Amino acid sequence: MNNLVIGTLFALCAAALNASIGVISKLLMHSGLNPQDIAFLKTIIAFFFLSVFLFKVPVSKKIAYISSTPSKLSVFTQIAICAFLGIFSLFFFETIAYNHGAAANVVVVLMASAAISALFFGRFILKESIYLHSLVGTLLAVAGISIISWKGENSLLMLINASIAGTGYGLFSVLVKRFKLNGGLFLTKYLLLFGSVYLAVPFLINLHSIHFNTDIVLGLIGLAVLPTILGFFCTTKALSYMSAAKVQVTELSEPIFAALMAWVFIHEQPTLSFLYGAIFIISGIVLINKAPKA
């Protein structure tokens, strides 16, 4: 398989895994957790799981795999910058946004902001060309996700927080390419390490007693494993094979997977607007992945 196919498959897997974030986060909030609790706890749990899983691998080997830069300090600095955008900014503002609006609306604003920011930051930071088909593909995919997910009501706080989260995520994907960091479990582990440190600050500021029960524990583990570990693994791997803009636009397929899961597991029939939106998203993904004419 060529790089485009492999990268697209990883990005689609990331979208499928990320489809679980909104629902689980909402359930955890209804169980008494606040946004700061969820963002920090899912990240530290994910970091713990990966640390145990990768315990026998020497640090030097992990760093050598992540980057060919000889200085460990430089590599950790680059990872710390990416973690601030891709973990702290994404998780912190995304979770707050879920507290101020419908999960579907948060997904629309966040993913649209990520796709658009990745396209333009890729132009200014990576000097990637922006072709007409890339612009049209991005707009089609954003229109598609809006048709499927937008619920009508909105909140200014939701829009602001989701936009910040999405823009940070888009810039994160560009900087991973700029720093030439090799995606995978090693990179994901260190992103989660720095992300846990950043997210500990708002968590401790808003510290309160948490009454853990089975639902809360299972919800946090679900968020830690599915979108946090596996989702970031797939996203960082996709960035190794294709541009940041292509990855972000492909991940706009997230609501398609969410709707398919609802159809399979809870027998919720797809609506006509879902079918129209899916056509727009798929057309957008095909267009942005189209090879430019020589």
Label the predicted regions.
Residues 1-41, 151-178, 219:
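Glycine-/small-residue-enriched transmembrane alpha-helix faces in small-molecule transporters
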Residues 30-89, 117-118, 168-172, 189-206, ...:
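Transmembrane alpha-helices of multi-pass small-molecule transport proteins
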Residues 20-22, 57-105, 119, 147, ...:
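Specific transmembrane alpha-helical segments of multi-pass solute transporters/efflux pumps
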Residues 19, 84-88, 92, 112-120, ...:
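Hydrophobic/small/kink-forming positions within alpha-helical transmembrane segments
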Residues 28, 38, 42, 97, ...:
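Hydrophobic/aromatic residues within transmembrane alpha-helices
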Residues 37, 43-45, 94-126, 244-263:
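Specific alpha-helical transmembrane segments that line the substrate/conduction pathway
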Residues 50, 121, 130-149, 199, ...:
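Hydrophobic transmembrane alpha-helices of multi-pass small-molecule transport proteins
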Residues 17-33, 38, 45, 91-101, ...:
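Juxtamembrane C-cap of transmembrane helices in multi-pass membrane transport proteins
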